[in-house]
């Protein structure tokens, strides 16, 4: 049986499960970034405050895109923090004020995200879901570049 965009319904349902995990990951990542943005201190305050804001704004957009992709595949996006916390593979961070530690948190979160994005890309390709393939491909390209930049910052 096919869904409204012509994909195998069972395969699309399996993809929705993975996209919901990514959605939960991005929600917790977003909140981690907000906390870093608010709580960062020290000599690198201005540059990191701005960078964390840039990153949380980008994460916010991705959250909406992922939720809408889930809906396009006839799934239901997770939408409560209870569900996010039960589903996420990203650890909540609390009261991080050190710049280096904050960047390390972001790097670790991005590593988790890119691993999940690659996994979803593979499943989407096997499902012939070009919409999700395109979305994940764009995310992976962005995430890899950001990881390179943040790792360079830490050296």
PLM regions: where:
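Disorder-to-helix initiation segments
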Residues: 1-22, 99-102
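Helix-loop segments that flank and shape redox-cofactor active sites
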Residues: 7-14, 28-54, 119-131
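Short, helix-capping/interhelical loops that line the mouth of catalytic, cofactor-
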Residues: 39, 76-98
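Long, contiguous binding/interaction regions
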Residues: 45, 77, 81-85, 107-115, ...
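Charged, amphipathic alpha-helical segments and their flanking helix caps
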Residues: 46, 53-64, 123-140, 144-149
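Acidic/histidine-rich alpha-helical segments that form the ligand environment
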Residues: 64, 68, 88-136
């Amino acid at each position: 049986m096919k869904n409204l965009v012509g994909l195998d319904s069972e395969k699309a349902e399996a993809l929705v499960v993975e996209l919901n995990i990514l959605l939960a990951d991005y929600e917790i990542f977003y909140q981690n970034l907000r906390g870093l943005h608010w709580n960062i201190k020290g000599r690198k305050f201005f540059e990191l405050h701005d960078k964390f804001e840039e990153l949380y704004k980008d994460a916010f957009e991705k959250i909406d895109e992922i939720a809408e992709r889930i809906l396009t595949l006839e799934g239901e996006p997770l939408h409560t923090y209870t569900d996010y916390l039960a589903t996420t593979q990203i650890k909540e961070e609390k009261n991080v004020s050190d710049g280096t530690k904050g960047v390390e948190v972001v790097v670790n979160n991005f590593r988790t995200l890119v691993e999940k994005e690659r996994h979803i890309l593979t499943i989407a390709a096997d499902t012939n879901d070009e919409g999700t393939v395109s979305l994940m491909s764009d995310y992976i390209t962005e995430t890899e570049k950001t990881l390179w930049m943040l790792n360079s910052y830490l050296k």
